[in-house]
Amino acid sequence: MSGKASTEGSVTTEFLSDIIGKTVNVKLASGLLYSGRLESIDGFMNVALSSATEHYESNNNKLLNKFNSDVFLRGTQVMYISEQKI
């Protein structure tokens, strides 16, 4: 079993390092959805995005805010991170 957990951890770490610099979606526990360029992520899932937009996740994903500076998202609120396919 320990081999499986080790493999899963390395796959997750590899995914996270591969998406740095790419456009991602980050969903928070509050239902807010952020999209932007992933600048950094740490072991606590704290996320820094640039060129970010903030949406409330719904059928129409209504735009709430567009940020001209970096956005920092606290890892305890992050539900998931996914690479945005263009």
From Swiss-Prot:
Would you tell me the Gene Ontology cellular component terms?
Lsm1-7-Pat1 complex; nucleolus; nucleus; P-body; sno(s)RNA-containing ribonucleoprotein complex; spliceosomal complex; U4/U6 snRNP; U4/U6 x U5 tri-snRNP complex
Q: Where are the transmembrane segments?
A: none
Put simply, this protein is called LSM complex subunit LSM6
Q: Which UniProt keywords apply?
A: Cytoplasm, mRNA processing, mRNA splicing, Nucleus, Ribonucleoprotein, RNA-binding, rRNA processing, Spliceosome, tRNA processing
Q: Which family does it belong to?
A: Belongs to the snRNP Sm proteins family. SmF/LSm6 subfamily.
Q: Where in the cell is it found?
A: Cytoplasm; Nucleus, Nucleolus
Determine if rRNA processing is one of this entry's keywords. Answer: yes
- A Pfam family matched in the record: LSM
Q: Which organism is it from?
A: Saccharomyces cerevisiae (strain ATCC 204508 / S288c) (Baker's yeast)
Q: Tell me, how does this one assemble?
A: Component of the heptameric LSM1-LSM7 complex that forms a seven-membered ring structure with a donut shape. The LSm subunits are arranged in the order LSM1, LSM2, LSM3, LSM6, LSM5, LSM7 and LSM4. Except for LSM1, where a C-terminal helix crosses the ring structure to form additional interactions with LSM3 and LSM6, each subunit interacts only with its two neighboring subunits. The LSM1-LSM7 complex interacts with PAT1; within the complex PAT1 has direct interactions with LSM2 and LSM3. The LSM1-LSM7 complex interacts with XRN1.
Q: Name one GO biological process term.
A: tRNA processing
The Sm domain covers which part of the protein? Answer: 11-86
Matches recorded under SMART domains: Sm
Gene3D superfamilies hit by this protein = 2.30.30.100
